[in-house]
From Swiss-Prot:
Organism encoding this protein: Rhodopseudomonas palustris (strain BisA53)
Pathway: Glycan biosynthesis; glycogen biosynthesis
Top-level taxonomic group: Bacteria
InterPro entries in the record: ADP-Glc_PPase, ADP_Glu_pyroP_CS, GlgC_bac, GlmU/GlgC-like_hexapep, NTP_transferase_dom, Nucleotide-diphossugar_trans, Trimer_LpxA-like_sf
Enzyme class (EC, first level): transferase
Protein name listed in UniProt: Glucose-1-phosphate adenylyltransferase
HAMAP family tied to this protein: GlgC (MF_00624)
Taxonomic classification: Bacteria, Pseudomonadati, Pseudomonadota, Alphaproteobacteria, Hyphomicrobiales
Length: 420
């Protein structure tokens, strides 16, 4: 247990971000990039939220473990997160899987992804490790979680939030006592246990953990020597500590950064095309629950140099117009109408098109007289003149990746296969 350290505890912590997952439920969006590198919110990547939370919380030592198709992610981190200065006792390390302790090319699990880099962590000598998943959308002050960890004398503190039971099978689910000490922890149960006072809800792990570094090292070395372990935090490390030590739950409501005092806490997994589309479209609300305009808690990212967005033509039937939409730098909207749409960097929309509730990634070009509704369009796609999506479900399903909720994911290979 920690003694003799005064707050803020973040200055004694290192954030370790697990960013190696593919995110296969995002389908073709992760064919060329890891899930943490997927674009979000007009100009950011998903990983920028965990990294920005760490930076805004006061953490100045950060490491990112990468694995699946890491080139896009590494390039983004090198360009957008290169401002840490060793002379100010700051560091930012990118840690690809690299056979550091064995002949295995890949990390064997989330715990192994930390274990293989113990020597790098040890060289910085942090008092605490804040272990983060790099693939969630939320704003959170990790200093408050660190404070609870120290105050309650925990071996591990687990970030958690309430989710509907029917959705809890994809999470670690816990049961806690009146002091939020974790009594049981089950990773991704087929039948998630309910909260005692809320039969339709479960208390789920956010994949955020706080450890004292020395204790974490001991646990990782013990786990690495266990041939029966899958070397995973949720499956192995956390249940072992619950049984043999003191594990405490930190409720997200205590540390979330809200868009305004009355707003609900906002955390999204964005692990499916439907969830990804919905979380982006959330940002088009007049007062969204996730505030990207908060100067006190900014989302840092790579600031690509682009010209301003431009809207041209102002004639009846040919007017460049965007309503309840986010339009990034370098975009040109030429005589077309957008509603509840996100345009990422460098998108070009030609005349007479109508676009509604669309998430359009960088450098897409939309031809003339297109009608696009409820779509996600991958980076660099060229949409041909006259394409209609969102009107005929059967035709959409034949041509594109159409989800249960009717969202169409469009990639360039899908466009190339069209018989137009």
């Amino acid at each position: 247990m920690t003694t003799g350290i005064e707050p803020p505890f973040a200055r004694h912590a290192m954030a370790y971000v697990l960013a190696g997952g593919r995110g296969s439920r995002l389908m073709e969006l992760t064919d060329r990039r890891a899930k943490p590198a997927v674009y979000f919110g007009g100009k950011s990547r998903i990983i920028d939220f965990a990294l920005s939370n760490a930076l805004n919380s006061g953490i100045r030592r950060i490491a990112v473990a990468t694995q699946y198709k890491a080139h896009s992610l590494i390039r983004h981190l090198q360009h957008g997160w290169n401002f840490f200065r060793p002379e100010r006792n700051e560091s930012f390390d990118i840690l690809p899987a690299s056979q550091r302790v064995s002949e295995e090319l890949w990390y064997l699990g989330t715990a192994d992804a930390v274990y293989q880099n113990l020597d790098i962590i040890e060289s910085y000598d942090p008092q605490f490790i804040v272990l983060l998943a790099g693939d969630h959308i939320y704003k959170m002050d990790y200093e408050k979680m660190l404070q609870q960890h120290v105050q309650q004398g925990a071996h591990v503190t687990v970030g958690c939030l309430e989710v509907p039971r029917k959705e809890a099978s994809g999470f670690g689910v816990m049961h806690v006592d009146a002091n939020d000490q974790i009594l049981s922890f089950i990773e991704k149960p087929a039948h998630p246990p309910a909260m005692p006072d809320k039969p339709d809800m479960a208390l789920a792990s956010m994949g955020i953990y706080v450890f004292e570094t020395k204790f974490l090292f001991e646990e990782l070395r013990r786990d690495a020597a266990d041939k029966n372990s899958s070397h995973d935090f949720g499956k192995d490390i956390i249940p072992h500590i619950v049984k043999h030590g003191k594990a405490v739950a930190h409720r997200f409501d205590r540390s979330c950064i809200r868009s305004h005092a009355e707003s609900a806490s906002y955390w999204r997994d964005v692990g499916t095309v439907d969830a990804y589309w919905a979380a982006n479209i959330d940002l088009t609300d007049i007062v969204p629950q996730l505030d990207l305009y908060d100067h006190n808690w900014p989302i840092w990212t790579y600031g690509e140099i682009t010209p301003p967005a431009k809207f041209v033509h102002d004639k009846v039937g040919r007017r460049g117009l965007a309503t309840s939409s986010l339009v990034s730098g370098g975009c040109i909207i030429s005589g077309s109408t957008l509603t509840q749409t996100l345009l990422f960097t460098g998108v070009r929309i030609h005349s007479f098109s109508t676009i509604e509730q669309a998430v359009i990634l960088p450098y897409v070009e939309v031809g003339r007289a297109c009608e696009l509704k409820n779509v996600v369009i991958d980076r660099g796609v060229r949409i041909p003149d006259g394409l209609v999506v969102g009107e005929d479900p059967e035709l959409d399903e034949q041509r594109f990746r159409r989800t249960e909720n009717g969202i169409c994911l469009i990639t360039q290979p899908m466009i190339d296969r069209l018989d137009l």
